[in-house]
Every structure is written in structure tokens, then in C-alpha cells.
């Protein structure tokens, strides 16, 4: 098992070779890794047509992040496991950000370690914010 791989925020499987924001496409659910959509999981229309939250619902029902990709995704291969902490977004539990109109977020990303945007991990950067 490759513990050094990074998880897809849509399906949770460790398939990415680089930390969040490198636009890798998940071979399991076909989600394109997008830093803005990880930070703002209710926001559609960046690299993916649907929001991360909607993509997670789609994956649960259709096996792919977007309905238009039905038939193009695949199941996890042997050795591809989910991140041990991963779970779908829970609005009652997760303190996720909503983008504000007119705010430039380009300089406010945690560029050194973007894994702090994983809302499901104890290291989530907004874990203590309320």
C-alpha cells in the first residue's frame, strides 16, 4: 500500500502523487484535484462542473464525481485504500469556508502544506475556528 500517496477529496482513495492543488485526475471517481474546490467545497465550476459536496453525493450514487462521466470511472485497485480519516463533508460538523465576492484568496492559501485543507483530518486549518 502506498501511504505516501495523497487522497482524493471526492472518494477518499489515496491515488494522487502530489499534495492538493496539482490538478491530477482521480482514476477512481474522475474528480480533478482543485485547490479552490477543496477550500470551498460548496463551490461548483472551477476545474469540476459540480461542487466537491455534490461530487461526493454523485460518487455514492453513481460511482463517479459527475454524472456525465458514468462508465468512465473504475473501482479501486488492490492496494488503493481510503485515507483512514476520510469521510464525506458533514455541514453540521465541518467548518468549511464559503467564498466571499470580491475577495482575492490567491495569497491566503497554505502554500507549503496544502493538506491542511483536508476538512476530515485533525490538522484541518479551520478545525478550531467557529
Residue ranges and their predicted role:
Residues 2-3, 9:
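Beta-strand/loop-alpha-helix module characteristic of Rossmann-like adenine-cofactor folds
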Residues 5-6, 23:
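Residues immediately within or flanking Cys/His clusters that coordinate Zn2+
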Residues 8-11, 26-29:
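Short cysteine-rich clusters marking metal-coordination/redox-active sites
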Residues 15-16, 30-33:
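Cys/His-rich microdomains that often coordinate metals
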Residues 17-24:
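Short linker/helix segments within small regulatory modules
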Residues 32-64:
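Short metal-binding segments enriched for Cys and/or His
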Residues 61-130:
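Long, contiguous alpha-helical scaffold regions
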